[in-house]
Regions:
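Phosphate/anion-contacting hairpin/loop surfaces
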Residues: 73-176, 181-188
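Gly/Gly-Pro- and Ser/Thr-rich, intrinsically disordered tail segments characteristic of DNA damage-repair
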Residues: 1-121
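Glycine-centered flexibility motif
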Residues: 4, 51, 61, 80-81, ...
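Basic, nucleic-acid-binding surfaces and adjacent catalytic neighborhoods in DNA/RNA-processing proteins
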Residues: 22-44, 152-276
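Generic detection of long, well-ordered alpha-helical segments
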Residues: 1-4, 90, 139, 143, ...
Length: 276
Protein backbone atom coordinates (compact mmCIF):
# COMPACT_ATOMS: atom_id res chain seq x y z
CA UNK A 1 0.00 0.00 0.00
CA UNK A 2 1.15 3.52 -0.79
CA UNK A 3 1.56 5.47 2.43
CA UNK A 4 2.51 9.10 2.97
CA UNK A 5 6.18 8.93 1.84
CA UNK A 6 5.32 6.96 -1.32
CA UNK A 7 2.49 9.35 -2.18
CA UNK A 8 4.79 12.34 -1.68
CA UNK A 9 7.36 10.75 -3.99
CA UNK A 10 4.76 10.02 -6.67
CA UNK A 11 3.32 13.52 -6.33
CA UNK A 12 6.71 15.19 -6.76
CA UNK A 13 7.50 13.10 -9.83
CA UNK A 14 4.04 13.52 -11.36
CA UNK A 15 4.17 17.28 -10.82
CA UNK A 16 7.42 17.40 -12.79
CA UNK A 17 6.17 15.17 -15.60
CA UNK A 18 2.46 15.80 -16.08
CA UNK A 19 1.55 19.44 -15.46
CA UNK A 20 0.36 21.05 -18.70
CA UNK A 21 -0.33 17.74 -20.43
CA UNK A 22 -3.73 17.01 -21.96
CA UNK A 23 -5.46 13.68 -21.33
CA UNK A 24 -6.34 12.00 -24.64
CA UNK A 25 -7.67 8.70 -23.32
CA UNK A 26 -8.84 7.11 -20.07
CA UNK A 27 -9.76 3.45 -19.84
CA UNK A 28 -10.84 1.39 -16.82
CA UNK A 29 -10.40 -2.34 -17.30
CA UNK A 30 -13.64 -4.37 -17.28
CA UNK A 31 -11.68 -7.07 -15.43
CA UNK A 32 -10.56 -4.73 -12.65
CA UNK A 33 -10.64 -6.23 -9.13
CA UNK A 34 -13.82 -5.61 -7.18
CA UNK A 35 -11.76 -3.82 -4.53
CA UNK A 36 -10.97 -1.00 -7.00
CA UNK A 37 -13.60 1.68 -6.42
CA UNK A 38 -14.25 4.02 -9.38
CA UNK A 39 -16.48 7.10 -9.07
CA UNK A 40 -18.48 8.05 -11.06
CA UNK A 41 -19.04 4.80 -12.95
CA UNK A 42 -16.07 3.74 -15.15
CA UNK A 43 -17.59 4.99 -18.42
CA UNK A 44 -18.54 8.42 -17.06
CA UNK A 45 -15.22 8.61 -15.22
CA UNK A 46 -13.26 8.15 -18.46
CA UNK A 47 -15.52 10.43 -20.50
CA UNK A 48 -15.10 13.26 -18.00
CA UNK A 49 -11.31 12.84 -17.90
CA UNK A 50 -10.72 12.74 -21.65
CA UNK A 51 -9.74 16.12 -23.12
CA UNK A 52 -8.90 17.68 -19.78
CA UNK A 53 -5.56 19.39 -19.06
CA UNK A 54 -3.57 18.74 -15.88
CA UNK A 55 -2.94 21.99 -13.99
CA UNK A 56 -1.27 20.91 -10.77
CA UNK A 57 -0.77 17.87 -8.56
CA UNK A 58 -0.93 17.82 -4.77
CA UNK A 59 -1.22 15.24 -2.03
CA UNK A 60 -2.69 14.85 1.43
CA UNK A 61 -1.99 11.83 3.59
CA UNK A 62 -2.31 8.73 1.42
CA UNK A 63 -4.12 10.37 -1.52
CA UNK A 64 -2.72 11.95 -4.69
CA UNK A 65 -4.83 14.73 -6.20
CA UNK A 66 -4.62 15.85 -9.83
CA UNK A 67 -6.28 19.23 -10.40
CA UNK A 68 -7.73 19.60 -13.90
CA UNK A 69 -8.74 22.60 -16.02
CA UNK A 70 -12.31 22.16 -14.85
CA UNK A 71 -13.55 22.12 -11.28
CA UNK A 72 -12.76 18.40 -11.15
CA UNK A 73 -9.98 16.80 -9.13
CA UNK A 74 -8.78 13.30 -9.95
CA UNK A 75 -8.19 11.57 -6.63
CA UNK A 76 -6.10 8.41 -6.32
CA UNK A 77 -6.24 7.32 -2.71
CA UNK A 78 -5.88 4.38 -0.32
CA UNK A 79 -4.24 2.40 -3.12
CA UNK A 80 -1.78 -0.45 -3.30
CA UNK A 81 -0.03 -1.56 -6.46
CA UNK A 82 1.86 0.17 -9.25
CA UNK A 83 1.25 3.68 -10.58
CA UNK A 84 3.71 4.20 -13.40
CA UNK A 85 4.57 6.44 -16.34
CA UNK A 86 5.47 4.82 -19.67
CA UNK A 87 7.24 6.40 -22.64
CA UNK A 88 4.64 5.08 -25.10
CA UNK A 89 1.85 2.53 -25.33
CA UNK A 90 4.20 -0.21 -26.58
CA UNK A 91 5.80 -0.46 -23.13
CA UNK A 92 2.64 -1.00 -21.07
CA UNK A 93 2.50 -3.97 -18.69
CA UNK A 94 0.18 -6.85 -19.57
CA UNK A 95 -1.91 -6.42 -16.43
CA UNK A 96 -3.52 -2.96 -16.19
CA UNK A 97 -6.61 -1.87 -14.28
CA UNK A 98 -6.62 1.76 -15.46
CA UNK A 99 -4.66 3.66 -18.08
CA UNK A 100 -4.51 7.31 -19.06
CA UNK A 101 -2.88 8.48 -22.31
CA UNK A 102 -1.33 11.94 -22.67
CA UNK A 103 -0.99 14.27 -25.65
CA UNK A 104 2.76 13.64 -25.90
CA UNK A 105 2.27 9.90 -26.45
CA UNK A 106 3.14 8.80 -22.92
CA UNK A 107 0.81 6.73 -20.74
CA UNK A 108 0.07 6.39 -17.04
CA UNK A 109 -1.07 3.02 -15.75
CA UNK A 110 -2.43 1.80 -12.45
CA UNK A 111 -2.30 -1.86 -11.49
CA UNK A 112 -3.98 -2.67 -8.19
CA UNK A 113 -2.64 -5.03 -5.57
CA UNK A 114 -5.15 -5.39 -2.73
CA UNK A 115 -7.46 -2.38 -3.25
CA UNK A 116 -7.64 1.11 -4.69
CA UNK A 117 -9.76 4.24 -5.09
CA UNK A 118 -10.25 6.43 -8.18
CA UNK A 119 -12.64 9.37 -8.17
CA UNK A 120 -13.43 12.63 -9.92
CA UNK A 121 -14.62 15.17 -7.35
CA UNK A 122 -15.09 18.89 -6.94
CA UNK A 123 -13.39 20.78 -4.12
CA UNK A 124 -16.71 20.83 -2.25
CA UNK A 125 -17.25 17.09 -2.68
CA UNK A 126 -13.71 16.37 -1.56
CA UNK A 127 -14.01 18.62 1.50
CA UNK A 128 -17.24 16.93 2.58
CA UNK A 129 -16.05 13.37 1.93
CA UNK A 130 -16.29 11.39 5.20
CA UNK A 131 -12.71 10.12 4.92
CA UNK A 132 -10.74 12.05 2.29
CA UNK A 133 -12.02 15.37 3.55
CA UNK A 134 -11.11 14.79 7.17
CA UNK A 135 -7.37 14.03 7.23
CA UNK A 136 -5.62 14.99 10.44
CA UNK A 137 -2.30 16.85 10.68
CA UNK A 138 0.34 15.74 8.19
CA UNK A 139 3.42 14.52 10.09
CA UNK A 140 5.58 15.06 6.99
CA UNK A 141 5.01 18.82 7.15
CA UNK A 142 7.76 20.81 8.92
CA UNK A 143 5.21 22.36 11.28
CA UNK A 144 4.08 19.05 12.77
CA UNK A 145 4.72 19.55 16.49
CA UNK A 146 4.47 17.44 19.61
CA UNK A 147 1.63 19.74 20.70
CA UNK A 148 -0.32 18.81 17.56
CA UNK A 149 0.17 15.13 18.34
CA UNK A 150 -0.89 15.67 21.97
CA UNK A 151 -4.05 17.43 20.83
CA UNK A 152 -4.90 14.66 18.35
CA UNK A 153 -4.43 12.03 21.07
CA UNK A 154 -6.46 14.02 23.58
CA UNK A 155 -9.31 14.54 21.11
CA UNK A 156 -9.46 10.87 20.13
CA UNK A 157 -9.16 9.67 23.72
CA UNK A 158 -12.28 11.62 24.67
CA UNK A 159 -14.21 9.83 21.91
CA UNK A 160 -12.68 6.39 22.20
CA UNK A 161 -9.70 5.06 24.15
CA UNK A 162 -8.07 3.42 21.13
CA UNK A 163 -4.95 1.29 21.18
CA UNK A 164 -2.08 3.23 19.64
CA UNK A 165 -2.13 1.20 16.41
CA UNK A 166 -5.76 2.08 15.70
CA UNK A 167 -5.07 5.74 16.43
CA UNK A 168 -2.04 6.05 14.14
CA UNK A 169 -3.44 4.35 11.04
CA UNK A 170 -6.72 6.30 11.09
CA UNK A 171 -6.24 9.23 8.71
CA UNK A 172 -8.55 11.68 10.50
CA UNK A 173 -6.20 11.43 13.51
CA UNK A 174 -2.81 11.60 11.76
CA UNK A 175 -2.48 11.63 7.97
CA UNK A 176 -0.38 9.28 5.87
CA UNK A 177 0.49 6.42 8.24
CA UNK A 178 -0.45 2.83 7.39
CA UNK A 179 0.53 -0.56 8.69
CA UNK A 180 3.88 -0.42 6.88
CA UNK A 181 5.50 2.56 8.62
CA UNK A 182 3.59 1.85 11.82
CA UNK A 183 6.03 -0.94 12.70
CA UNK A 184 9.13 1.27 12.65
CA UNK A 185 7.37 4.16 14.38
CA UNK A 186 6.30 2.00 17.32
CA UNK A 187 9.68 0.28 17.51
CA UNK A 188 11.52 3.62 17.66
CA UNK A 189 9.01 4.90 20.23
CA UNK A 190 9.34 1.64 22.25
CA UNK A 191 5.56 1.21 22.34
CA UNK A 192 3.39 -1.87 21.93
CA UNK A 193 0.69 -1.52 19.24
CA UNK A 194 -1.81 -2.54 21.93
CA UNK A 195 -0.96 0.30 24.33
CA UNK A 196 -4.07 2.36 25.06
CA UNK A 197 -4.05 6.12 24.48
CA UNK A 198 -5.00 6.79 28.10
CA UNK A 199 -1.90 4.92 29.27
CA UNK A 200 0.56 7.12 27.34
CA UNK A 201 2.73 9.38 29.47
CA UNK A 202 4.08 12.74 28.34
CA UNK A 203 7.41 11.02 27.79
CA UNK A 204 5.74 8.35 25.65
CA UNK A 205 4.09 11.01 23.49
CA UNK A 206 7.39 12.84 23.10
CA UNK A 207 9.12 9.65 21.96
CA UNK A 208 6.22 8.88 19.64
CA UNK A 209 6.47 12.30 18.01
CA UNK A 210 10.21 11.88 17.48
CA UNK A 211 9.67 8.41 16.03
CA UNK A 212 6.98 9.57 13.61
CA UNK A 213 9.10 12.45 12.32
CA UNK A 214 12.31 10.41 12.10
CA UNK A 215 10.64 7.51 10.30
CA UNK A 216 8.58 9.45 7.80
CA UNK A 217 11.13 12.17 7.02
CA UNK A 218 13.75 9.51 6.40
CA UNK A 219 11.37 7.61 4.14
CA UNK A 220 10.47 10.73 2.16
CA UNK A 221 14.16 11.47 1.57
CA UNK A 222 14.66 7.85 0.48
CA UNK A 223 11.77 7.96 -2.00
CA UNK A 224 9.67 5.49 -0.01
CA UNK A 225 10.16 1.87 0.99
CA UNK A 226 12.29 -0.58 -0.94
CA UNK A 227 9.18 -2.72 -1.48
CA UNK A 228 7.27 0.03 -3.34
CA UNK A 229 7.91 1.45 -6.82
CA UNK A 230 7.91 5.08 -7.89
CA UNK A 231 6.47 6.63 -11.07
CA UNK A 232 9.39 5.29 -13.11
CA UNK A 233 9.20 1.75 -11.75
CA UNK A 234 12.17 2.20 -9.40
CA UNK A 235 12.03 1.04 -5.77
CA UNK A 236 12.56 3.43 -2.89
CA UNK A 237 15.63 3.05 -0.70
CA UNK A 238 14.03 3.10 2.75
CA UNK A 239 14.61 -0.33 4.30
CA UNK A 240 12.16 -0.92 7.17
CA UNK A 241 13.58 -1.86 10.55
CA UNK A 242 10.68 -4.26 11.08
CA UNK A 243 8.60 -6.04 8.46
CA UNK A 244 7.90 -9.63 7.41
CA UNK A 245 11.57 -10.08 6.46
CA UNK A 246 12.64 -9.56 10.09
CA UNK A 247 10.17 -11.98 11.71
CA UNK A 248 12.19 -14.25 14.01
CA UNK A 249 15.40 -12.25 13.53
CA UNK A 250 17.18 -10.71 16.56
CA UNK A 251 15.91 -7.33 17.69
CA UNK A 252 18.47 -4.70 16.57
CA UNK A 253 18.37 -3.20 20.07
CA UNK A 254 18.31 -6.16 22.50
CA UNK A 255 18.67 -9.36 20.48
CA UNK A 256 15.28 -10.83 21.41
CA UNK A 257 13.57 -12.51 18.41
CA UNK A 258 11.16 -10.23 16.57
CA UNK A 259 7.61 -11.51 16.93
CA UNK A 260 4.82 -11.47 14.36
CA UNK A 261 1.27 -11.11 15.64
CA UNK A 262 -2.08 -10.43 13.99
CA UNK A 263 -3.78 -7.40 15.49
CA UNK A 264 -6.59 -5.14 14.29
CA UNK A 265 -6.77 -6.61 10.82
CA UNK A 266 -3.08 -6.74 9.97
CA UNK A 267 0.30 -8.13 10.89
CA UNK A 268 2.40 -6.47 13.59
CA UNK A 269 6.14 -7.01 13.99
CA UNK A 270 7.57 -6.07 17.36
CA UNK A 271 10.12 -6.75 20.03
CA UNK A 272 8.33 -8.09 23.14
CA UNK A 273 11.11 -6.75 25.37
CA UNK A 274 11.69 -3.25 23.97
CA UNK A 275 8.07 -2.41 23.16
CA UNK A 276 5.68 -2.20 26.10
Amino acid sequence: MFEGPEVRTLTRQAEQELVGRRITLSSVSPTRPRFLSVSPDPLAFSEQLTGRTIQRITCTGKSLRTHLDTEAILVIGETGGRFQLHAHSDTLPKKIHWQMALDDGRCLTLTIQMWGFLALMTEEELASHPYLGSDGPDPMDPGFSVEMLEEAIRTRQLEKNDPIKAFLIHGPNIAGIGNGYLQDILFRARLSPKRKLADLTDRDVGRLHEAIVETLSGAVQAGGRDTELDLYGEPGSYVPLLDRRQAGAPCPACGEPIQKTQYLGGACYLCPVCQT
